[in-house]
């Protein structure tokens, strides 16, 4: 859900299935301009369920499930399982975010590269969905006026694009294949 900017307004333990799927029909939303602190529930004044907090709420919910299973599974085994959450979530999150940029083999350096882009999007208040859909048409730093025009701080985005060009060259993936892959994971509308 984070890949597309979806925000659960209430992500309590009773609103999450044993498979980790959320099943609440209460408040929800999609981030417009990228804001990790976005809250879609007017009663969540402290931001417990803010966009950036949703992964840790998932872990909180899994801890609650583990407490319910302690009579069936040892505390040590449950603890070992829960310790894998952050690494597993982080790996999958960056794979999904990398796919939005056409990056097929995400490395630790890519996660920093993605974080850098998100900081730029946040500072510039760029529409999350539209940006990622638009970047599907990206060719190179020199041919990105359609994207660069969205940014007030063009120098910051231009610097990111220069690094993006380097990363795309490393992939050695034809532009049309990359574009097709990106269109499949970057919705036009949410």
Residue ranges and their predicted role:
Residues 40, 45-190:
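Regulatory N- and C-terminal appendages and interdomain linkers associated
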Residues 1-4, 96:
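Phosphate/ATP-binding catalytic cores across multiple sugar-kinase/actin-like superfamilies
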Residues 3-8, 12-61, 67-71:
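Catalytic activation segment of kinase domains across protein kinase-like and atypical kinase folds
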């Amino acid at each position: 859900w984070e890949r597309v900017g979806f925000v659960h307004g209430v992500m309590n333990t009773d609103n999450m299935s044993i498979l980790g799927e959320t099943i609440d029909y209460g408040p929800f939303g999609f981030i417009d301009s990228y804001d990790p602190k976005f809250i879609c529930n007017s009663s969540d004044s402290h931001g417990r369920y803010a966009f950036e907090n949703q992964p840790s709420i998932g872990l909180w919910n899994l801890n609650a499930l583990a407490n319910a299973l302690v009579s069936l599974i040892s505390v040590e085994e449950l603890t070992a399982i829960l310790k894998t959450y952050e690494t597993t979530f982080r790996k999958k999150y960056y794979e999904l975010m990398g796919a939005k940029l056409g990056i097929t083999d995400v490395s630790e350096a890519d996660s920093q590269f993605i974080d850098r882009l998100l900081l730029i999007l946040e500072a510039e208040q760029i529409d999350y969905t539209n940006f990622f859909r638009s970047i599907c048409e990206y060719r190179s730093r020199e041919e990105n006026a359609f994207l660069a025009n969205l940014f007030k701080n063009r120098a910051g985005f231009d610097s990111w694009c220069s690094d993006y060009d380097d990363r795309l060259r490393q992939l050695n993936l034809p532009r049309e294949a990359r574009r097709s892959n990106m269109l499949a994971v970057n919705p036009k509308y949410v």
